[in-house]
Amino acid sequence: MKFTTLLFLAAVAGALVYAEDASSDSTGADPAQEAGTSKPNEEISGPAEPASPPETTTTAQETSAAAVQGTAKVTSSRQELNPLKSIVEKSILLTEQALAKAGKGMHGGVPGGKQFIENGSEFAQKLLKKFSLLKPWA
């Protein structure tokens, strides 16, 4: 039982790290490019030349539009799912995967390995019922 608890806690920690990495990746865009600012070393065109928007503006607009769409997707998904439920779902999934992988090697080598795997699966099912979660990965 202690091993199962430690395995579950490791899965929760892994899910938290994964969630934090995913959120930091979406905010890693260059702020100067999103704001549409130009580089300070660029030459200023004279008054005789026609005023045309630089190409970096269109790139910045595309980048900011993509960032807005990405932010909207993240916001809508967060509104739909409670973040705690999402973390619990991920940790249960990781626990089930770890138990499945452990079960492949334990059945023949360790006495009581099959019972350990069955108890771990029952534990994951109890958690699903306790938090009233559906299995989205099944």
UniProtKB/Swiss-Prot annotation:
Residue ranges, compositional bias (Low complexity): 43-67
Superkingdom: Eukaryota
GO terms for biological process, alphabetical: calcineurin-NFAT signaling cascade; calcium-mediated signaling; defense response to bacterium; epithelial structure maintenance; negative regulation of apoptotic process; negative regulation of lipopolysaccharide-mediated signaling pathway; positive regulation of calcineurin-NFAT signaling cascade; positive regulation of calcium-mediated signaling
GO cellular component: extracellular region; extracellular space; secretory granule
Start and end residues of each stretch annotated as Disordered: 20-79
InterPro entries assigned to the protein according to its UniProt record, in alphabetical order: Dermcidin/Lacritin
Lineage: Eukaryota, Metazoa, Chordata, Craniata, Vertebrata
UniProt KW Iron keyword: no
UniProt tissue specificity: Expressed in secretory granules of many acinar cells in lacrimal gland and in scattered acinar cells of salivary glands.
Secretion signal span: 1-19
The keyword Glycoprotein belongs to this UniProt entry's keyword annotation: yes
Glycosylation sites: N119
Role noted for this protein: Modulates secretion by lacrimal acinar cells.
Keywords annotated in UniProt: Glycoprotein, Secreted, Signal
GO terms, molecular function: collagen binding; growth factor activity; laminin-1 binding
Cell compartment(s), UniProt: Secreted
Record protein name field: Extracellular glycoprotein lacritin
